[in-house]
Amino acid sequence: MAFLWIHVPISRIWYSNLRKCYIKMLYISYKFTIMKEVLIIMWIADGWKEYEVIDTSKGEKLERWGDYLLVRPDPQVIWDTPRKNRGWKHMNGHYHRSSRGGGEWEFFDLPHQWELHYKDLTFNLKPFSFKHTGLFPEQAANWDWFGDKIRNAGRPVKVLNLFAYTGGATLAAARAGASVTHADASKGMVGWAKENAASS
C-alpha cells in the first residue's frame, strides 16, 4: 500500500518558528486490517512581518493585518480558552457570523482600504462579504515554494493561474520571473488584482 503525501500550507497560528512540521498519523487500510504510517508535511507561512494570528478562542481568531486588528470566525477554533490578550478589546473590525448564514462586519476606526506587504509584494486590503479581506496569508508558503521553482528553472516559465482571486499567486509568480496569465470569473476580483499589481 502506498504512502499518502499531503501538502498543506498553514499560517503561524499553530507553530511559531518552524519551517516544516512533520506529523505521523496512522492510516487504516480499506480492509481495516493493516495499519500504515502517513507522513503529512505542513509548510508554515513564516515570512510575514505585517500579518500574524495573535490569539484564538471561542470559534474566532484575532489577527493583525498591518496596523489593524481584526476578529473573524474560524470553525477550526473549537476551544474555549480565556481571552487574555488585550487585542480582543481593541479590535478595529469584527465579523459577526449570522445563524442564518453569512454575517456582517462591525468596524471600529478601520479605513475602507489599506496596504499589506509580503516581502516585495504589496496588497490592497478591504473587508468584504463572507469575512474576507482580499488575501489568504497562509498561501504565502506556496508563493515562496513555486517562486523558488520558477527562479531555479533555468528556462522561461509560463503560469496559468485559474480562480486567481485578487492575485497573490499571480504577483508572486510574476515577481519570480514567470509570464503569468491571471484568470478569475469575477470582474471585481480581476480589477482588484490589477490594483495589487499596480501597487507592487
Regions from the language model: what does each represent?
Residues 2, 8, 37-38:
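Acidic, Ala/Val/Gly-enriched low-complexity intrinsically disordered segments
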Residues 41-45:
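N-terminal accessory targeting/assembly segments
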Residues 48-64, 70-137, 144:
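Non-catalytic substrate-recognition/targeting regions of SAM-dependent transferases
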Residues 147-200:
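Conserved SAM/SAH cofactor-binding pocket of Class I
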